[in-house]
A protein has these predicted regions:
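N-terminal membrane-targeting hydrophobic helices
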Residues: 1-143
């Protein structure tokens, strides 16, 4: 899935659970693995994966900063968003190195049953997850 999808889901999980951080942290990392099982479309199969990847990382950074500064989420809670998306750094790094099959995170290995789908369905699934995550983040206020 896109990094921004993982980041928003991580923010939502942290907002919904509310702490402590040491409980939320493994849950958001596990959520990354579970979400990678859901059939989705990745820009790594497109003609311009690095461009899409950089835009995705920028959107993820914006979501994190909005949650932290604009919504007033405590730092530890807001940081769970980037933690949830962090495993996807290996995808961008692999693309930048022109070695798209070399990954360190287990749900990105070829042996992992990574969910894949067509573009329309795969983007739609991620849009629904993002929208639901935003609803949870906003509904959980104040933190």
């Amino acid at each position: 899935m896109w990094v921004s999808t993982h980041v928003l889901a991580g923010l939502a999980i942290a907002a919904a659970i509310g702490g402590p951080w040491w409980l939320v942290l493994p849950i958001v990392v596990l959520a990354h693995v579970v979400m990678d099982l859901i059939p989705h479309w990745d820009y790594t199969v497109s003609k311009h994966p690095v461009v899409y990847g950089c835009c995705d990382f920028a959107a993820s950074l914006a979501a994190w900063l909005l949650a932290w500064f604009a919504l007033g989420m405590p730092f530890w809670m807001a940081f769970m968003g980037p933690i949830s998306g962090a495993p996807d750094w290996d995808v961008l790094i692999a693309e930048l190195r022109k070695r798209p099959d070399v990954h360190w995170f287990p749900s990105h290995w070829k042996s992992f049953p990574h969910g894949r789908s067509g573009r329309a369905w795969g983007i739609g699934v991620q849009a629904v997850i993002m929208a639901a995550s935003v609803v949870v983040v906003l509904a959980a206020r104040p933190y």
